[in-house]
Amino acid sequence: MAKNGLVICILVITLLLDQTTSHTSRLKARKHSKRRVRDKDGDLKTQIEKLWTEVNALKEIQALQTVCLRGTKVHKKCYLASEGLKHFHEANEDCISKGGILVIPRNSDEINALQDYGKRSLPGVNDFWLGINDMVTEGKFVDVNGIAISFLNWDRAQPNGGKRENCVLFSQSAQGKWSDEACRSSKRYICEFTIPQ
């Protein structure tokens, strides 16, 4: 009888151990399943963020293409002529509000393209603002982002305005040569938009 009781006790202990092991395995499986769900949730959030980034980039490209249709495309830039006269700072702010900057020619090809575009889109206009100035340090010309200008296309005897004339004009009558001018003068201008690659 004691032997039967011992056998029954061993069977009950074995069943309890088996159930405990089975329960522990199920708990581990649930934890693993929760971790996989959490990981997938993180992956989905990352994918959604990437999609939003792509959607916003496509919106920018579409807006830029609209600008390019109204203006002209040169190399990896689009140019868009202004409607009215503004002083240098207002012109730059207007270009920024449209997603661009005041035009900055970086080589002779861009000078030629600007001259052609300026004649077509700003008929009768002798000069327009460039995104170049020496407001911070006299004689050190930088673009509107503060980067030093390496390509220069000054007209004869220019720059000549000293501290009174810190902003730069593109002169149609001087075949695209530059001159310095008082930044408070009201002039036409051309905005430049970089085409994403």
Swiss-Prot record:
It comes from Homo sapiens. Restricted to cartilage and breast. Also expressed in breast cancers. SMART domains: CLECT. It is found in: Secreted. The lineage of its organism: Eukaryota, Metazoa, Chordata, Craniata, Vertebrata. Keywords: Disulfide bond, Lectin, Secreted, Signal. GO terms for cellular component: extracellular space. One of its GO terms (molecular function) is carbohydrate binding. Residues 74-192 form the C-type lectin domain. Pfam families: Lectin_C. This is C-type lectin domain family 3 member A. GO terms for biological process: ossification; skeletal system development. Its main location: secreted. SUPFAM superfamilies: C-type lectin-like. The keyword Secreted applies.
